[in-house]
Amino acid sequence: MDSASASGAQRQDEGLRERMRPSPPVDIDAVDQALATAGYGVTTDNRTSDDKKTFGRTPDGTIFTVPQTHDMVSQLLSPTEPKNVSDLLVLAILAVHILIFWALSPQSRIPVFAAIYMFWRTSYNGGIGWLLHNQSHHNTMVRWATKSKIFVNPSTGKNPRPILYRLLKKDMETMIPKDYSFDEAPLEYNTWLVFRRFVDVILMCDFTSYCLFAIACGSRPENETTLMTALRWAAGWVLVIFNLWVKLDAHRVVKDFAWYWGDFFFLIDQELTFDGVFEMAPHPMYSVGYAGYYGISLMAASYKVLFISIIAHAAQFAFLVLVENPHIDRVYNPPPPRKRSVQHDLKDLNGFNAQTSPISDSFAATPAPNGIDDKASMQQPPSSVHNLLGLHNLDLHRVTDSSVILIQLLVFALTVLTPSTPFYQYLFVANAAIWRCWYSIGIGYILHRQSKYKSWTRHFVKYGENTDEAWRQWKGSYHLSMTMCYASFVAATWKMYSMPSDWNHGLALLKHTLGFSLAALQIWTSVSIYDSLGEFGWFFGDFFFDAQSKLTYSGIYRFLNNPERVLGLAGLWGAALITSKGAIIFLALISHILTLAFIQLVERPHMQKLYGRSLRKDAGLVKNLKRSLPPPLQQLGGSVDRIMDESFEFVEELLDSARPKLATGVNTFMKDAKSLFRQYPARITISRLDDEVAAGYNLEDYSLEIEGTESSPSAQVERSSGKEGANARAPPERRGDLKSLIFEYGAPIRVKWTAPLNHSKKDWVGLYMVTDNTRREVTRISSQGRWIATNEGAYDSLTCEKGLVTSDIVISASRRRDGENRDLASGEMVFSGDKLFWTQGVFEFRYHHNGKHNVMAISRPFEIRIGRFDEEDVVDMDNTTANSDGLIQAAIEEALLPVVRNCFDRNPEIAPETYDEHFGSLVDRDGKYAKRVVFAVHQMFGVELAPEVVRADGNVRNMAWRICNAKKVLAPYSMSRSRGTTTPTTQEKELS
C-alpha cells in the first residue's frame, strides 16, 4: 500500500485530548482591556504581571484566566499539597476497599472484587460517558448547576443550599490557592471543577479495585522455573513502567484541562498540538496507555486478570468511539467552507450533449477553464460513487461483487465438504501459496509495468476504451485477487487447525487469545489504511492517474510510514500461532517476505518517482524514539534505522491490538440497535389522566395553529387520480373556509400555541403521525426527538429548545376569539430538520402537559406530499430535439433546488442558493442529507439514486443532468404514456 495518503483533501487527525501547547507570554492587562472594549465579559482575579497565563473562553464569550491545577495523584497523595474534604473522602473510600480485601477470605476476594471493579469500570465508561455525552450535546451539567443555583452566593437569597455552597467554596479554593476565586469564576469552570472531583473518585477506585483483584488472582503456575518467573515479572514491570511513562508524558502535553475533558465545558485559546507520546501512537492514553494492565496480568499469571483487562480496554475504546471522537469532530474539525459556484464550459451551457456529463468537471479541486482539452480532463481521477470495499457497498448487480461472492461460496463449500486428510491439506496449502504469489508477484508486475509504461491503460485505449474503463477493470481484478488470496489462506488454516483437547493444558488458551488479537489488529490496520487512503489510494490510483495530489500523512500514517509492512500481516502470524503448524508458518513467512519485496520493488520506486523529496524519512514513532537515543546512536542509518523502524512499529502496535475488533463491533452494534429502536420505538403507557389536568386546567384555553409552505400544485392535483367513481372525480364541496393543509417535504413548520397563564413550564409540543395514536386524550408513542419545550430552561437539554421562538406572550381576554374573559399565554416554535418526519404522510401536533403525555390540544391534521414532476408541462412530448432536453433539464433544476434546500435544513453552510453552488462538506460527513434527497428524487422523478451519487454530484445542476439522462435511459421501460410513434392513447385521441 502507498506509504502515505495521496489525496488533495486532507482530513484533520482523528482527534484526541492531546492538543494543548503552552501559550506564549501575553500582556494580561492589555488583553483584558481589549476584550472589554470589544464587549466581552471579562472576569477579574488577582495576578502578577510576571505570570504566564492561560485564557479560557466560555460558550457565551466570557474570557477568564484558567488557574493552574495539579494532577489527581499529586493532589491526593503528595504531603506537600493541601488537603480538603473531598480529598479525605476519596482516601477514605480507597481505604474501605483495602479493608474489604483484608476482611474477605481468599476464596471470596476474586468474585467480590471482580464485581467491584466492573462496577467502577461501568461507572467510568458508562457513567462518565453518559454525563459527557449529554454535556457535549445539551450542556446538561451546566444546566443542572444553573437550575440548582449551588454556585450562587447565599447573600443574594437565591441559593437554597447555603451549606453546600460554603463546602464547595472552601474545597475548591483550598485545592486551587492561586489565581482562583469561587465567586468570580465562570459557572462553566466551577461546574468542571465539581465534575473532576467526581471523576477522581471513580478513577482512583477503578484502579485500586483492579489492583486488588489482580492480587487476589495472583499465583505461580505449576512447574514454572525460577528463570521463567523472573522473566515474567521483569516483562510485567517493563510494561507497567512504560504505562506510567505514557500517562506522565500525556499529562505533560495535555495538562489537567484535557485530562479531565475540560473542552466539554469551555475552551482554551490555544492550538491543537501533537507532541511526545502523541506522535508515537494513535490515542496513546487509551491504546498503549493500557499496557500496564497486561503487565499486571502477566505478573499475576491469571487468565481471569487478562480477560477482565481486555474487557476494560474494550470498554475504554467504546468510550473513545462513542463519546470523545464525536465531540472532537464537532468542536475541532468543523466542516470547511464550501465553494459557492462552479465554472462551466461555454459549450456545456450552449448545448446539452447527452454523451458528456458535467460531473467530471466538478471533481477537480479547481474548475477547468473554458476550452480545456478533453485529454487533460482524462488525467483527473474519476469521482468515486460506487465503491467496492465494505459490506455496505456490496452490489450483486455488479459483476465484480457477484463473482467474488460466488467464488467465496465455492471455496467455503470445498473447505467444509472435503476431509482434512494430508492430501487435501497439502492441496489447500499449495492453493494458498499460489494465490499469495499471484497477489504479490503478479499484481506487482502489472503495477510495475503500469508505472513505467502505462501498459494496463494502453491495452484498453487500444480497443477504444478510456482511462476510466481501465481503472474500473483494474479495481475489479485487484479486488478479486485480494479476496482470493486471503480466502485461500483462511481455508488452508481451517484445514490445518485442530481443536485443543484440553484448553487448560499448556499455552492453548493464551495462543488463541493472542492469535485472535493479532487478527483483529490486522483488520483494524486495514480499516485505518483505507480510511486514510480512500478508494483511490487503496487501489493504487496514482499508478493510473497523474493527478496533482498533495502528499499528506494523516490517520495511521501520522505514526507509521508503511503500516502494512508488519501490522498489515499480523493476522497471518496470529493464524500461525493458533495452529502451531509448520505449513501455516511457511505461508505466513512467504507472505511477509513477498509483501516486503512488493513494497521495496514496486511501491517505493513509484512513490519516489512521483513525490521525490516530499517523501518523509521517519514516521512519528521512529522520530520520537531517535530523540530519546544518545547522539552517537542517532547518527546510525541505513539498515539499523530500518530494523528499528520495523521492530518498534511491531511492539507499539501490538500493544494496541484490543482496539480494532471493538471499533468494528461497536459500530455494528450501534447500527443494529438504532435499527431496532426505529422498528420498535419505546412506548409509554398511561392508565389515567393526571389529577391536576382534570382539576385545574380548562382545555378550551389550549390551542395549536400551524403554518407551513404549501406543496406544489401538482401535489394537490394528484389527489384526484382518475381511478375514482364518477361522483368522486369532481372537486370536493367545502362548507367552511378551511382547506386541506398540504405542506412541502422538509419545509419548516411554524406552530403557534396558547395555554392558561398558569400552565406548567414543562409543557411540550410533539409531532406525530395521525395513525400512530388511537386516543385523543393520551399519547402512547414516543416522539423520538420530534418535540420542543414551550419554555426555556425547563429541561436539562438544549435539543428540546431548538426551534423555540417565543414563550409566554400574554394575550388579553379582549383579543380572544371565543368570547372568554380569561387572559392566555402564547408562544411560537418552528419544527425543522431532525424534528420533522422525512417521509410522506398525514401528521399532527400534540400539546402535552407538565412533561407527561396527557394531551391538552391537537392541531389540524396536515399532509406532507411530494408532487411528481411532469415533463408534459414543460415541452411537447413529440419534440425530441436537443432544445427539448435543455428545457427539461432547466425545469428539473428549478423543481429540484427548493427540495434540496429543504433536505439540507435550509442551512446556509450546506444548502445551495443557485443551481451551480456546491453542497457544503457536511453533506459528505452526515449521510442523512443525501438520503433525504434520494427519497425526494425518487418520489418526484421516479428515478432511484444511491446516496453516494448525491455527494459525488455536488450541486443541483449535476443532479439535474443525471436525472434527465436517467429518465431518457429508462423511458423505453416506463409504464407511463410513450413518447414514441406507437398507437395514440385515449387521451391523445381526445386532444387531437
Swiss-Prot record:
BP GO annotations: methylation; phosphatidylcholine biosynthetic process
Bias type Polar residues, positions: 1-10, 709-719
InterPro entries the record matches: Phopholipid_MeTrfase (IPR007318), Phosphatid-EA_MeTrfase_fun (IPR016219)
Residues in compartment: Lumenal: 1-84, 133-197, 247-279, 324-403, 448-477, 546-581
Molecular function terms from GO: phosphatidylethanolamine N-methyltransferase activity
Chain's role: Catalyzes the first step of the methylation pathway of phosphatidylcholine biosynthesis, the SAM-dependent methylation of phosphatidylethanolamine (PE) to phosphatidylmonomethylethanolamine (PMME).
Name the UniProt record assigns to this protein: Phosphatidylethanolamine N-methyltransferase
